[in-house]
Amino acid sequence: MCRSLRYCVSHCLYTAMTRLEEANREVNMYSSVRYLGYLAQLSLLVAICMGLYVRWDQTDDSFILVIFILGLVIFAIASILYYYFSMEAASLSLCNLWFGFLLGLLCFIDSSTFQHDLKEEATKYLLVSSIIIKTLSALVERICGCVRHRPTLLTSSEFLELVGFAIASTIMLMQKSLSIILLVAALAMIIIDLRMKSFLSIAILVVFASLTPELFFRSLDIPVNPYALSCFFFCIISNPFLDVYFSGLSVTERWKPYLYRGRFCRRFSVISIGLIELVFFVFAALKLGDLHLWYFVIPGFSIFGIFWLICHIIFLITLWGFNTKLNECHKVYSTHRPDNNSLDRVMASKGMRHFCLISERLVFFSLLATIILGAVSWQSSNGLFISIFLIVLPLESMAHGLFHELGNCLGGTSIGYAVVIPTNFCSPNGQPMLLPPEHVEELNLRSTGMLNSIQRFFASHMIETYGCDYSTSGLNFDTLHSKLKSFLDLRTSDGPRHDTYIIYYTGHSHSTGEWALAGGETLRFETLLEWWREKNGSFCSRLIIVLDTESSQPWVKEVRRVGDQYVAVQGAEMARVVDIEEADPPQLGDFTKEWVEYNCNPDNNINWTEKGRTVKAVYAVSKPWSDYTLHLPTGNDVTKHWMTYFPHITYPLVHLANWCGALNMFWLCKICYKCLKRLKMNWFLPAVLDTGQGFKLVKS
């Protein structure tokens, strides 16, 4: 046995030293962060080996010895696949599956008789250190920009670890094992809920973390190792939990695995949700067999059970109607795909925003009905009921989050105006001057490229174009004043103002950020902001200014002080000193080219945090930027929605949901949430900010 342990330790040390040699070949931040992750895995592996050894040593159970030896063989096979056959995916899959399985064994094998053993204490410390290192590694990876977020529900490693943990529960009786398998499914739903950034995902996570150790495992009456259970929970939840803040994916990007799924799969998911809801209702009805509190249970279940049924009929009709409208959007999307119309733009044109805003209120009532019915029919000794309840909560939370986020990001109209002044030289008084003839052709090509890029940007995101002014001699103040005021006064064909106004400028600027215009005139940020206040008034439109100039930082700093308008400035910062042997000196247009490519090509490989960039991105937003919301549906919209999708018998509940939604019952929570969002935007500005219009603001 000691030989096996020595072999395991020596193999792990060999792996670590091999990794260290690879890191020494190319020492950089990314390899250092990755090495921290390897340390967490090594600590966990040693903890598992020591924990299994202690259990075998104390119980003399040959099953543990067989599993331990088999685990070593599996890890040896994984190492061979990784190092000799370059089958990294297969190797990591085997490791993740066995990590989950062995952690489950540590969790479920009774250790109460030897919990004060010295080696068992060391195992506990190793498990705790693994939690700390894993969490720290995940945090550092995201702070350093080493993680490239991609649309997914569950990663392969998370899925395999969950499967391994569920398989480990089969060492118990069937009913207890089934309860734990359903609990693992609930944890998978919560991971997806967090990754989708659902509005109630954190609250659902807190409920899960509170109920599981205190009530669920107590209902099963089984001894559980809290250290192994905590290690499994924190290691698997740390990445999706941190991604709630660090993920820069837009709403449609996060929900891509569902929104872009085939029609049959989406319909099947709705039917599956309906079956899960029905199973929950059946288990809740088992409470009627408790005659001890019949005078409370029977009336309570009768009232809230009927309320739950009506709410969930509306819930399923809403999901079915959403998929019907989504199918229509996919038909249009497949027809107009060559025109670069994204799916979210098509959904906006099909009226999905109003549908989602109304549906959000109805789904919230369904979630509230589930919580009430769960409380009324609570069964503290039934692990199956608790696990199914914990599955239903994140499912309904995801539906609420989908409608909430789509309702907030879809439907915004936008209009853009671009000014391209291809002058690089200025007179001492600040007036732009024409370039020498030998540079004209080169500059014209570069300026035309900038013009084409910004036109591509407008077309790709279905931004209505007011105009793209290209002037080699510069624009005077009066001309620019007239054009900008006309642009800022534009409205949609239906009458209201556009939701977002985008101004793009590239050309010469002074060190203070002022635009250098013809005749020695300038345009200051305060002047443009005053024009915007004059035209926007009490409306809730946004202004986004994109600058490709040598001195955009002053405007980026000034916009942070704006407290009464929704304004954002995206600028560029050019390196002052560049090694010509390593990279070309930065020029105007380089930022535009990269920024447009980043926002128009989802398969781009642009890394804004890359070390040694000659052109860096900077942006800032005004103080109330995070408070921005689109217009809400009116009572007439709700009535039309009800008449279109729901039977007449459900109208009272639909009307009640609309009335309660208008009451703003959670105004205090929304105020706190608004304050937290403002704090985040003012003090912890994210590296990537989704504007909700299909493009993003970025900073290096």
UniProtKB/Swiss-Prot annotation:
Q: Where in the cell is it found?
A: Nucleus membrane
Q: What's a single GO MF annotation on this record?
A: sodium channel regulator activity
Q: Which UniProt keywords apply?
A: Glycoprotein, Membrane, Nucleus, Transmembrane, Transmembrane helix
- Topology within the bilayer: Multi-pass membrane protein
Superkingdom of the source species:
Eukaryota
Instruction: List each coiled-coil range.
Output: none
Q: Which PANTHER family match?
A: TRANSMEMBRANE PROTEIN 168 (PTHR14437:SF2)
What family does the Swiss-Prot or TrEMBL record give for this protein?
Belongs to the TMEM168 family.
Annotated function: Plays a key role in maintaining the cardiac electrical stability by modulating cell surface expression of SCN5A.
This chain belongs to which protein, by name? Transmembrane protein 168
The gene name on file is tmem168
